[in-house]
């Protein structure tokens, strides 16, 4: 999986990051190639069940809420063996689900975490040469790089401590020749960039408040420059991903965050969840503290914002689901609610969108497929037959969903 041209473009900064340089058929990191849950594919399945349209399913040991990633002919997923105190990464053959390699890393797992968390909630990332995983070993944030083809460990490092009574969930975000990790915690927080090939630290910045959050940062191109946008630590902030320099900051709108923001129609759109819940949009072109000047709207309402699920967008509309299962469509520039409907019960997974359809997966494994439009139209509800917490991955006409016990590949064989 060389693709030298794509990699050289990414390293030169022609496009935002390593994930953005991945081929359109790949889903190489959290929420896909742009980190926003959007796929350009047009031939995804709309109907399945445990007995229908399942290309394969592979048993996954242990417990984990991380999402699968797909690159070329490989699928990767992480899990944790709580009793054995091991963090596990598996590499599967994408056409069959056959196990290609597995690596188990001993880790002192945190004894008490939130009931909706797991010891393997961070989604891995890959560039086709290395696979990066993130987990806690005692109080150490631990990053390991494995060889894509063989699974051999290439490097291991501890960027810092992580103190969070609810556990850990910081997914690795590739950018050019770096990987970037959020270290918001109940102590001195940090945002750190490591050289992807070696694990050597490139830059580090302190976060403003000692408050845990669980968000993956998102890389976006704004007004001709790359920005890394991160919610957490009682704020939303934009950074220069090459240097870590703070570009702008908005105070609040709440204390703790799990969902990741998205960028559309020249605005940063985000949901937030504890203790306040709502939907917020920010103009990311300002400098310094822009709380009073660049917040386009802030709608504080529990049914409008997801604490855990991130938003997704198609065309000029944004789609959100609350943790309690209320799906909605909104205007991202004004916050005006277009429609709101119940989509099952509790949701942890972030929705994905492709070919004019939004795929909402609830915790029971039901997938609510809705037209990505300003008029609500439920296309179909499909049952997987297994609880799920991770977000779907999309690749080459197939949908990959991680259940409580299996990884499912949905679509034609």
Q: Residues of each region from the PLM?
A:
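Bacterial N-terminal signal peptides that target proteins for export
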Residues: 1-12, 17, 21
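Noncatalytic, solvent-exposed loop/strand surfaces
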Residues: 22-413
């Amino acid at each position: 999986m060389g693709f030298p041209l794509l990699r050289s473009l990414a390293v030169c900064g022609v496009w935002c990051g390593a994930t953005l340089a991945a081929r359109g058929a790949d889903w190489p990191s959290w929420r896909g190639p742009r980190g926003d849950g959007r796929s350009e594919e047009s031939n995804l399945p709309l109907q399945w069940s445990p007995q229908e349209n399942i290309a394969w399913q592979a048993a996954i040991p242990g417990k984990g809420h991380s999402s699968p990633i797909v690159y070329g002919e490989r699928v990767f997923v992480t899990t944790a063996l709580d009793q054995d105190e091991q963090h596990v990464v598996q590499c599967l053959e994408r056409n069959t689900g056959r196990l290609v390699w597995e690596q188990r890393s001993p880790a002192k797992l945190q004894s008490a975490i939130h009931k909706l968390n797991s010891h393997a909630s961070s989604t891995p990332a890959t560039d086709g040469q290395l696979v990066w995983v993130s987990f806690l070993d005692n109080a150490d944030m631990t990053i390991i790089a494995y060889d894509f083809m063989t699974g051999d460990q290439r490097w291991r490092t501890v960027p810092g401590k992580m103190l969070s009574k609810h556990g850990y969930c910081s997914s690795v975000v590739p950018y050019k020749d770096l990987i970037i990790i959020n270290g918001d915690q109940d102590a001195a927080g940090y945002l750190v960039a490591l050289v992807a090939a070696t694990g050597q630290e490139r830059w580090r910045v302190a976060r403003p408040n000692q408050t845990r959050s669980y968000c993956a940062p998102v890389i976006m191109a704004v007004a001709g420059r790359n920005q890394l946008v991160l919610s957490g630590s009682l704020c939303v902030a934009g950074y220069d991903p090459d240097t870590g320099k703070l570009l702008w900051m908005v105070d609040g709108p709440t204390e703790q965050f799990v969902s990741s923001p998205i960028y559309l129609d020249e605005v940063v759109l985000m949901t937030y969840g504890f203790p306040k819940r709502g939907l917020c949009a920010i103009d990311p072109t300002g400098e310094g503290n822009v709380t009073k000047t660049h917040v386009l709207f802030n709608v504080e309402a529990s049914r409008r914002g997801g604490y855990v699920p991130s938003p997704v967008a198609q065309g000029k509309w944004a789609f959100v689901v609350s943790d309690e299962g209320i799906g909605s469509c909104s205007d991202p520039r004004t916050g005006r609610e277009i429609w709101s409907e119940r989509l099952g019960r509790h949701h942890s997974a972030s929705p994905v969108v492709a070919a004019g359809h939004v795929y909402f997966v609830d915790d029971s494994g039901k997938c609510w497929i809705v037209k990505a439009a300003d008029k609500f139209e439920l296309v179909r509800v499909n049952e997987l037959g297994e609880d799920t917490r991770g977000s779907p991955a999309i690749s080459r006409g197939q949908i990959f969903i991680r259940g409580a016990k299996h990884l499912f590949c949905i679509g034609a064989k």
